């Protein structure tokens, strides 16, 4: 049966039945699986683009409590949306979600119910369009995320690089063939669940797999975990970053990053990357001058945080600093504010800055001289 999974209708029917029976018996009880509301399903799928299921529950609950309908999300400010998204990372998702909500609200508040209509929304790619259209609207579109790619590569023993366009097209075609018509939502979620919980990257639990008898990698390879082929990892550059907790009396200076680009729209303790030949203190003074056009005195380092992004990592050194002169300007930021430390919770910060805030507890306003 292994050799003919995609060639025999009976094998495909068995595969569907076995997979769906396993899913219905073992699926996790997740908030976004308890609804058919397209808006809530859309929110969950945008979050799942770069966030593991086991990390998402609290974030999903917080976000939909803040914005229970697409009209609520559309009416919010970008700052409110970013604050509700705070901690999830990949903030372009939140900005695109906000833009898309405004488009949907302007057209009456009904999310598009087709793959093509969903694909036209900001921040919606082929995976999200397939997931939402199948789960919310019963459209027969297979999903192809990392979990499903891994499952299909092993089932079919595809040894070519799944990032290649031709291989990706073959995987989508296989998904279309295997898909249970009329049950695409459950089928897609079953495939993703199988990849997340059983057909895992490093140590697949083949003995627990409901469709193991169809798997060519299990039948023909000594180690199914060899598939899919993994690209060699490129070394990630590491940067030293200095940030300033700049006091003016009892107030702290915070700056908002430009809306486009990394961490767009988030607030931060201003600073930047250390350049060759300068100390961290010199780096901070230079960055503040270039970004805000003010002069500061840099004092001691208060906290040090390690943080990783997709393509690089940083060590963030947070320094106490004192404002000396100049009127802040938006030379390298979107906005700036002097705030009482008690007000920091009103602003959306990156995870690295949140770690600084948490580590410092925060500073007592009386200890800033």
Locate the predicted segments by residue.
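Short, low-complexity, intrinsically disordered N-terminal peptides in bacterial proteins
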Residues: 1-14, 361-369
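Catalytic cores of DNA base-excision repair glycosylases
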Residues: 4-9, 18, 22-207, 211-220, ...
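A residue-level signal for conserved active-site and pocket-lining positions in enzyme catalytic cores
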Residues: 23, 47, 191, 209, ...
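Acidic, metal-coordinating catalytic segment for phosphate/diphosphate chemistry
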Residues: 208-242, 308, 315, 347-363
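N-terminal strand-loop-strand
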Residues: 220-268, 297
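The catalytic Nudix box helix
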Residues: 269-303
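NUDIX/MutT-family hydrolases
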Residues: 318-364
């Amino acid at each position: 049966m292994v050799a003919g999974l995609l060639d025999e209708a009976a094998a495909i029917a068995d595969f569907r039945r076995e997979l769906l029976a396993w899913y219905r018996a073992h699926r996790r009880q997740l908030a976004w699986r308890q609804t058919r509301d397209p808006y809530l399903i859309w929110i969950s799928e945008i979050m799942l683009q770069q966030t593991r299921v086991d990390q998402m529950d609290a974030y999903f609950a917080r976000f939909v409590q803040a914005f229970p309908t697409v009209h609520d999300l559309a009416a919010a400010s970008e700052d409110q949306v970013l604050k509700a998204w705070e901690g999830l990372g990949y903030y372009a998702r939140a900005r695109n979600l906000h833009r898309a909500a405004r488009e949907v609200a302007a057209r009456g508040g009904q999310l598009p119910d087709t793959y093509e209509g969903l694909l036209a929304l900001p921040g919606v790619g082929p995976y999200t369009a397939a997931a939402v259209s199948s789960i919310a609207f019963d459209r027969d579109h297979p999903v192809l995320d990392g979990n499903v790619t891994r499952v299909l590569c092993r089932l079919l023993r595809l040894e070519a690089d799944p990032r290649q366009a031709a291989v990706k097209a073959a995987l989508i075609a296989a998904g279309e063939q295997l898909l249970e018509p009329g049950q695409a939502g459950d089928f897609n979620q079953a495939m993703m669940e199988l990849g997340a919980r059983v057909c895992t990257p490093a140590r697949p639990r083949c003995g627990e797999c409901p469709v193991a008898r169809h798997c060519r990698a299990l039948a023909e390879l000594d180690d199914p975990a060899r598939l899919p082929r993994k690209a060699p990892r490129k070394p990630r550059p590491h940067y030293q970053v200095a940030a300033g907790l700049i006091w003016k009396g009892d107030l702290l200076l915070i700056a908002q990053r430009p809306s486009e680009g990394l961490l767009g729209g988030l607030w931060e303790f201003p600073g930047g990357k250390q350049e060759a030949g300068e100390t961290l203190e010199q780096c901070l003074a230079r960055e503040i001058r270039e970004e805000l056009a003010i002069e500061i005195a840099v004092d001691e380092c208060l906290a040090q945080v390690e943080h990783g992004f997709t393509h690089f990592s940083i060590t963030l050194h947070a320094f106490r600093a004192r404002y000396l002169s100049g009127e802040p300007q938006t030379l390298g930021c979107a906005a700036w504010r002097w705030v009482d430390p008690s007000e920091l919770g009103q602003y959306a910060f990156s995870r690295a800055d949140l770690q600084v805030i948490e580590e410092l507890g925060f500073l007592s306003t009386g200890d800033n001289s």
